């Protein structure tokens, strides 16, 4: 009468061992899957972070290409981009306004508006995170105008609303380039010439929008235009009235920086807006 009870006990132990083995196997599989998933996420984050660093280098290379051809009519170049974890957008039709004023006694104040575009790479903060509100420049500076040598390009990193952006735009350069004489009545009057150089980015309608994958970002100088402003009728320039300087400010979308102050040494001044229209396309 006791033997069946012993057999039943062994059977219960056998079932218990089987259940334990199944539980251990399922647990091991689950842990393996979790570890694999975590490892994959880490790998994806590393790849996304690497792409961001490469995108910065590609933006710098593209800027070099663009500035190299900007003042050479019909010249063109390209730079290679590979984007999987973010996206590159070509943003057209943004306002660039140049304002020129003299000193308190000067007789001139002029403004010119141009349309331009810029290039934006964006990715999520899961791949790279600088902190909400972060902004810094790795090419140029926040200033929208310079009166000396240096890059026209302005490349910044900005983080907002869970995204990190690399933005490439182009500022303005201005300086006194020459002095010449004009005859006014019986007098010879010295006139300063101030050149204002502008790189205007043109983006074709068909290419506006988002780009992902492998592609060449191309740039081509479409034309060079000089727009002279020689002052009132007669074309001899604006009278300085003793104020030997001009102040030039540039508003590029929401960005406006303090004026570039150009020192002058003549009695009059003329301005030349020298515009390079550069097409950017994929």
What annotation goes with each model-predicted range?
Residues 1-13:
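N-terminal leader/signal peptides at the extreme start of proteins
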Residues 86, 94-104:
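N-terminal beta-strand/beta-hairpin edge segment
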Residues 71-89:
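Short, glycine/small-hydrophobic-rich surface segments
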Residues 15-27:
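N-terminal signal-anchor/signal peptide hydrophobic helix marking the start
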Residues 58-73:
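N-terminal alpha-helical signal peptides/signal-anchor transmembrane segments
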Residues 26, 30-59:
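Aliphatic-rich helix starts adjacent to a transmembrane/signal segment
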Residues 103-268, 279-282:
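Intrinsically disordered, low-complexity regions enriched in Pro/Ser/Thr/Gly and acidic residues
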């Amino acid at each position: 009468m006791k033997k069946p009870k012993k057999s039943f006990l062994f059977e219960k132990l056998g079932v218990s061992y089987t259940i334990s083995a199944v539980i251990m196997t399922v647990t091991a599989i689950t842990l393996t899957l979790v570890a694999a998933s975590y490892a994959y996420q880490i790998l994806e984050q590393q790849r996304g972070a690497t792409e961001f660093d490469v995108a910065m280098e590609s933006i710098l290379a593209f800027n070099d290409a663009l500035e190299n051809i900007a003042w050479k009519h019909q010249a063109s170049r390209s730079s290679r981009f590979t984007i999987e974890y973010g996206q590159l957008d070509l943003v057209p039709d943004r306002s660039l306004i140049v304002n020129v004023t003299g000193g308190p006694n000067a007789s001139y104040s002029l403004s010119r508006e141009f349309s331009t575009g810029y290039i934006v790479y964006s990715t999520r903060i899961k791949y790279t995170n600088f902190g909400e509100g972060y902004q810094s420049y790795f090419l140029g500076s926040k200033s929208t105008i310079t009166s000396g040598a240096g890059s026209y390009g302005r490349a910044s990193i900005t983080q907002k609303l869970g995204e990190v952006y690399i933005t490439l735009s182009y500022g303005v350069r201005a300086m006194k380039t020459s002095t010449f004489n004009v005859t006014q009545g019986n007098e010879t009057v010295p006139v300063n010439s101030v050149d204002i150089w502008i790189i205007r980015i043109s983006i074709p309608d068909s290419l506006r929008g988002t780009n992902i994958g492998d592609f060449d970002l191309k740039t081509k100088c479409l034309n060079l235009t000089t727009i002279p402003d020689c002052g009132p009728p007669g074309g001899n320039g604006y009278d300085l009235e003793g104020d030997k300087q001009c102040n030039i400010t540039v508003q590029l979308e929401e960005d406006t920086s303090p004026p570039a102050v150009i020192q002058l040494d003549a009695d009059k001044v003329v301005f030349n807006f020298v515009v390079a229209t550069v097409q950017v396309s994929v």
